[in-house]
């Protein structure tokens, strides 16, 4: 694996890079607005990305994650953290793409649920990698979650149960995509990668 941005450039620059990427998302929507048939869909897309990134999504999940350090949390709190911290943005990205491409309500719903499951699987695997990974694989020091006493799936459920849950979620992503035929294959392959990744 490669060193993470905060290892290469420092924490301040890594945070600014995240800020820049977040604003770039809005720029990309604005730049492509003219290609969308329904102008209201563009406003909806901007609102959805903002919600997923802000206090109703990623920021809100991160706040609960930080506030939970060193505490025993329930399975519900852990799921809240992961669904908001990680899954909200993945779900929103897929939802916005499906809506702007003109997907009907059932297609958008299927993509939304696939995004939710994919985001949750991604975070569970991330938790597992923090336990089992190496600096060479991850690009960052493993074991940080345990040292900070963070709420993680392995800490609450154990490694094997965490692996089973991640695999179950990935399989559910692929089931949700079955109705899309070949158009869903790239996202199914991404789901497999999320489960098999080493960094």
Regions found by a protein language model. Name each.
Residues 1-175, 182-195:
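Mg2+-dependent prenyl diphosphate-binding active-site environment of isoprenoid biosynthetic enzymes
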């Amino acid at each position: 694996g490669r060193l993470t941005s905060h290892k290469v450039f420092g924490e301040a620059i890594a945070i600014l890079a995240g800020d820049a990427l977040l604003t770039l998302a809005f720029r990309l929507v604005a730049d492509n607005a003219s290609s969308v048939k329904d102008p209201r869909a563009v406003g909806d897309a901007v609102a959805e990305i903002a919600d997923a990134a802000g206090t109703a999504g990623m920021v809100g999940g991160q706040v609960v994650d930080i506030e939970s350090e060193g505490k025993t949390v329930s399975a519900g709190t852990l799921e809240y953290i992961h669904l908001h911290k990680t899954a909200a943005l993945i779900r929103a990205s897929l939802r916005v793409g499906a809506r702007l491409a003109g997907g009907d309500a059932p297609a958008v719903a299927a993509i939304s649920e696939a995004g939710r499951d994919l985001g949750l699987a991604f975070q569970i695997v991330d938790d597992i990698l923090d336990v089992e990974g190496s600096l060479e694989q991850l690009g960052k020091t493993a074991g940080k979650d345990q040292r900070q006493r963070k709420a993680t799936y392995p800490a609450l459920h154990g490694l094997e149960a965490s692996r089973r849950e991640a695999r179950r979620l990935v399989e559910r992503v692929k089931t949700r995509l079955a109705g899309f035929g070949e158009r869903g294959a790239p996202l199914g392959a991404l789901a497999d990668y999320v489960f098999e990744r080493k960094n």
